[in-house]
UniProtKB/Swiss-Prot annotation:
Extracellular topological intervals: 24-202
Positions of transmembrane segments: 7-23
Localization per Swiss-Prot or TrEMBL: Membrane
PANTHER family named among the record's database cross-references: PROTEIN CBG06620 (PTHR38612:SF1), PROTEIN DCT-5-RELATED (PTHR38612)
Keywords in alphabetical order: Glycoprotein, Membrane, Signal-anchor, Transmembrane, Transmembrane helix
GO annotations of cellular component type: membrane
Name this protein carries in UniProt: Uncharacterized protein C29G2.6
């Protein structure tokens, strides 16, 4: 149950004081561990994307088969603790569940997550659903670039390890642009509603 919540909250992977350049160096071991310890179910994802066009369903599959509970604790705890962004995200989960706002960064994302908790009546499944349906978009709408940057790097690792560039139909660009297109497919209606045709995925 708690792993499901961590998975939903991972899409939020909220702020840190580190910039993107430091993230690459300090979190490289964590990203590699996520593949080595099978926190990402790469065999299943590789089959699901093989021969498929980019779609919203592809985003849902990546979400479903990436276990951030494993990344945060059971599989890559040491690597997570050495990566300030990952450690910060774990600590913020506690703050979110207690209804506290510990950071002034990514206010739209944080406010959405806090609202999910406040209106959930402590129902973890309702929190999970709310975060996925209402809040994940704010990781990619340009209001929280550190969130989108981190999630994109997790995807880049699975993309390279799973050879997604050779498997996804009609796509030959780099992994980070692939994820950008997947995010855009998932949240197309919300980007259009907000007057944006393209999202931000790092």
């Amino acid at each position: 149950m708690i792993t499901d919540f961590l998975l939903a909250f991972s899409i939020l992977a909220v702020s840190t004081t580190l910039g993107v350049s430091n993230l690459n160096k300090q979190c490289r071991d964590l990203l590699q561990c996520s593949i080595q310890k099978k926190c990402v179910n790469l065999p299943v994802l590789s089959k699901l994307v093989d021969g498929k066009n980019i779609s919203a369903e592809m985003y849902d599959d990546i979400d479903k088969y990436t276990d951030y509970g494993c990344i945060f604790t059971t599989g890559c705890q040491d690597e997570c603790n050495d990566c300030p962004l990952c450690l910060t995200s774990k600590l913020q989960i506690v703050d979110i569940l207690s209804g506290e706002k510990s950071s002034a960064e990514c206010p739209t994302l944080m406010d959405c997550a806090l609202k999910c908790v406040a209106e959930s009546n402590q129902d973890i499944f309702q929190i999970n659903k709310c975060l996925r349906q209402d809040c994940a978009f704010h990781c990619f709408d340009g209001s929280c670039p550190k969130c989108s940057g981190f999630i994109t790097r997790v995807f880049n690792q699975m993309c390279a390890a799973g050879n997604f560039r050779q498997k996804i139909k009609g796509y030959s660009g780099p992994c980070y642009e692939m994820f950008h297109e997947i995010v855009r497919a998932k949240f197309a209606d919300r980007f259009e509603k907000n007057g944006k045709t393209r999202g931000h995925s790092g």
